[in-house]
Curated annotation (Swiss-Prot):
Keywords: Aminoacyl-tRNA synthetase, ATP-binding, Cytoplasm, Ligase, Metal-binding, Nucleotide-binding, Protein biosynthesis, RNA-binding, tRNA-binding, Zinc. InterPro entries: aa-tRNA-synt_IIb (IPR002314), aa-tRNA-synth_II (IPR006195), aa-tRNA-synth_II/BPL/LPL (IPR045864), Anticodon-bd (IPR004154), Anticodon-bd_dom_sf (IPR036621), Beta-grasp_dom_sf (IPR012675), TGS (IPR004095), TGS-like (IPR012676). This is Threonine--tRNA ligase. It is found in: Cytoplasm. It comes from Ruegeria pomeroyi (strain ATCC 700808 / DSM 15171 / DSS-3) (Silicibacter pomeroyi). GO terms for biological process: threonyl-tRNA aminoacylation. Disulfide bonds: none annotated. Its EC number is 6.1.1.3. It catalyses: tRNA(Thr) + L-threonine + ATP = L-threonyl-tRNA(Thr) + AMP + diphosphate + H(+). GO terms for molecular function: ATP binding; metal ion binding; threonine-tRNA ligase activity; tRNA binding. Zn(2+) binds at residues 344, 395, 521. Belongs to the class-II aminoacyl-tRNA synthetase family.
Length: 648
């Protein structure tokens, strides 16, 4: 039999018969590894222990200590185990798909009766029984006809449809544990007993259309979470509890910030308190952008399809655009327009007005651009995922040799903004050239080197995402980690070689000839709406004082203090503090409790003593103790706290 060479991570190589499996390789290394092995990586691909290896390859054997691979396999196996459990309890249930998702998995079922929360406990119990059986997981490749006939005989029409959609060149792979099987690409664990039975939990039930098509059957989706150990599951569930307390939708109601309603799906009704946060943040960003050398512009909301066709968005993005057709007077045909989903083509139009010289570069253009994108109703989520939003959008038109310096400046700019908003640390993902791309390798080499060099010069080692760049250029993504460990991708910095060419942007170089500028798409916050949602959840509603919509409430203890309350409010407002009076005929404890729920940072209580001494009793949000300060001192202190950080 032909021999192949397998090279291990330490550089050592061994010879094996062609067709050897990773399980056999693990057994050749040691009995202990053979028992602990869960999967392999072969030439960069995640590989089942049962799959044969036909040619020379790089190989790594994985155990449960390799968390990325272990999590994927555990969650994948649990999807199968859950589907089996459901069919063992309710045999008439039809199965569809069950992919791994972040922190867990889901599986979609076609069942006549709705699942209930109580059913989740029954399913979990059955799943643990299956795990405890420690049944081997086996796999076979079947001929397409055999697989289709098998599922037809078992009344599984969704599996038949899936098989019929698989390209003819791909194998039809089946997986078993015990009597139960599923159509699956794999890989999977060696046996069900490798799944930690105390490290998973079924979380919720939801509806989902088959293939995401509202014209197809409505299915029932069960979500689960899983990890490689009990403590990790416990930590995750604690994080979810904390996240529920911080949910911006809940806090938005308590703080009277905004609401959504069915007549305007994915659109936000900002209340005065919420709009105060929005405008305060926007004013701060406007000042910082001006200091950063940006010129602010504003572009149309409704733009003819001809521009979107020229930019390429009509072809690639039309399904996410809101189309507007108008019968214009005397026009031979309808005018077809679209609400802009992004600002970049419009910014190129401004750049193209008038002749540009190399001396004009870099030209940094910014817009608080209102955009509209169609998002499926099931994807909408509070103010985090909406259809109408405003980007802190910017485009830098520059020469190729300015990419690195502009990237470095943007990273400094972004770091300052995040620090001011309470995020001291962030990580960066770097996505380089995909297989299909525009531009020469030489230009890509230069752009990729520039982004990497600028990032490392800022003391940041980016996480590499090979091949994940856009076809028109490499990109950086800036990821914030919040107080409970969740990651939020906010800022972006994207090199674009294509749009300037498609929209014929040029400048006159030092040689007197026309040149194409490079376009750098950049955003710091992303969308204002989503970032405000992140801020609310990061701070659990206790926003930095300068951003809080209601900074101070001055509450009377007795009606005889009402005039002094109004005087205190006037003093604070004159010092730049957002202060309001509460002179209602309610007990002071009731007032304090109500305003604390509304996340007012400072409550000043005023009674007879405070009137006589011209003081206030200061209660800060989250603190039980109060202190007494003079009106003059508290006005100076709170006036300074209310000042945005860039104005201190």
């Amino acid at each position: 039999m032909a021999q192949i060479s397998l090279t291990f991570p330490d550089g050592n190589a061994r010879s094996y018969d062609a067709g050897v499996t990773p399980a056999q390789v693990a057994a050749d290394i040691s009995t202990s590894l053979a028992k602990k092995a869960i999967s392999a990586t072969v030439d960069g691909k995640h590989w089942d222990l049962q799959w044969p290896i036909a040619t020379d390859a790089q190989i790594a054997i994985h155990t449960m200590a390799d968390e990325a691979q272990a999590n994927e396999l555990v969650r994948h196996d649990l999807a199968h185990i859950m589907a089996r459990a459901v069919q063992e309890i309710w045999p008439a249930t039809k199965v569809t798909i069950g992919p791994v998702i972040e922190n867990g998995w889901y599986y979609d079922f076609d069942r006549a009766e709705p699942f209930t929360p109580e059913d989740l406990g029954l399913i979990e119990k059955k799943m643990k029984e299956i795990i405890n059986k420690r049944e081997p997981v086996t796999t076979e490749v079947w001929e397409r006809t055999r697989a289709i006939e098998f599922y037809k005989a078992n009344n599984e029409p969704y599996k038949v449809e899936l098989i019929e959609a698989i390209p003819g060149t791909e194998p039809i792979r089946m997986y078993w544990h015990g009597h139960w099987q599923d159509l699956c690409r794999g890989p999977h664990l060696q046996h069900t007993g490798q799944v930690p039975g105390d490290a998973f939990k079924l979380m919720s039930i939801a509806g989902a259309y088959w293939r995401g098509d509202s014209n197809r059957p409505m299915l029932q989706r069960i979500y689960g979470v899983a990890f490689t150990g009990k403590e990790k599951l416990k930590a995750h569930l604690h994080m979810l509890e904390e996240a529920a307390k911080r949910d911006h939708r809940k806090l938005g109601r308590e703080m009277d910030l905004f609401h959504m309603q069915e007549e305007a799906p994915g659109q936000i009704f900002w209340h005065p308190n919420g709009w105060t946060i929005y405008t305060t943040l926007q004013d701060y960003m406007r000042r910082q952008q001006r200091r950063g050398g940006y010129v602010e512009v504003n572009t149309p909301q409704v733009v003819d399809r001809k521009l979107w066709e020229a930019s390429g968005h009509w072809e690639k993005y039309q399904e996410n655009m809101f189309i507007v057709e108008v019968d214009e007077e005397h026009a031979r045909e309808k005018a077809v327009n679209a609400l802009k989903p992004m600002n970049c083509p419009c910014h190129v139009q401004i750049f193209n007005q008038g002749l540009k010289s190399y001396r004009d570069l870099p030209l940094r253009m910014a817009e608080f651009g209102s955009c509209n994108r169609y998002e499926p109703s099931g994807a909408l989520h509070g103010i985090m995922r909406v259809r109408g939003f405003t980007q802190d959008d910017g485009h830098i038109f520059c020469a190729e040799d300015q990419i690195e310096s502009e990237t470095a400046e943007f990273i400094d700019f972004l770091s300052m903004i995040y620090k001011d908003l309470g995020f001291e640390k962030f990580s960066v993902k770097f996505s380089d050239r995909p297989d299909t791309r525009a531009g020469s390798d030489a230009v890509w080499d230069k752009a990729e080197a520039a982004l990497l060099s600028a990032t490392r010069a800022a003391g940041i080692e980016p996480e590499l995402n090979p091949g994940e760049g856009a076809f028109y250029g490499p990109k950086l993504e800036f990821v914030l980690t919040d107080a409970i460990g969740r990651d939020w991708q906010c800022g972006t910095h994207q090199v674009d070689f294509v749009l300037p060419e498609r929209l014929d942007a040029t400048y006159i170089g030092a040689d007197g000839a026309k040149h194409r500028p490079v376009m750098l798409h950049r955003a710091t916050l992303g969308s204002f709406e989503r970032f405000i949602g992140i801020l609310i959840e990061e701070h659990a509603g206790k926003l930095p004082f300068w951003l809080a919509p209601r900074q101070v409430v001055v509450a009377s203890i007795t009606s005889e203090a009402d005039d002094y309350v109004r005087e205190v409010v006037a003093e604070l407002c004159a010092a730049g503090v957002r202060a309001e009076a509460d002179t209602r005929n309610e007990k002071i404890n009731y007032k304090v409790r109500e305003h604390s729920v509304g996340k007012v940072p400072v409550i000043l209580a005023v009674g007879h003593r405070e009137v006589e001494e011209r003081t206030v009793s200061v209660r800060r949000l989250g603190e039980k103790q109060t202190s007494v300060q003079s009106l003059a001192d508290v006005t100076i202190e709170l006036g300074r706290a209310a000042t945005p950080p860039d104005l201190l």
